[in-house]
From Swiss-Prot:
It holds the Pfam family UPF0102. It comes from Clostridium tetani (strain Massachusetts / E88). GO terms for molecular function: nucleic acid binding. Coiled coil: none annotated. This is UPF0102 protein CTC_01256. It comes from the Bacteria. NCBIfam families: PRK12497.1-3, YraN family protein. InterPro entries: Restrct_endonuc-II-like, tRNA_endonuc-like_dom_sf, UPF0102_YraN-like. CDD domains: PoNe_Nuclease. HAMAP family: UPF0102.
Amino acid sequence: MNSYNKQIGNIGEAVAENYLIQNGYIILDRNFSCRVGEIDIIGKDGDIISFLEVKSRYGNLYGSPGESVNFAKQYKIYKTAQLYILKKKLNRFYFRFDVIEIIFNNYNDDYSIRLIKDAFQL
């Protein structure tokens, strides 16, 4: 990943985290990684543990950001989530996989954000 894309990703994750907090989430972890993969944000939404993939981009020219969360990426998130659940002893909770799409406007600091709850299941 080039540094420009990484910068957009970091800004997107910060925007997503603020959005989640404003909407009542408790942030449990950020950028949890293991040998299998990485999860951008792990939050608690009521009594549900939410594993969130944040996808950010400028404009919508190449489709919605969430479209890039293909089956291979979903599987890595799922396997990483399993390890997180075991490590943190969270097996008593329900959990789901969400995607947050952030599209930045090319002309100013404005952006649109969309939270897709239960974006995928495995």
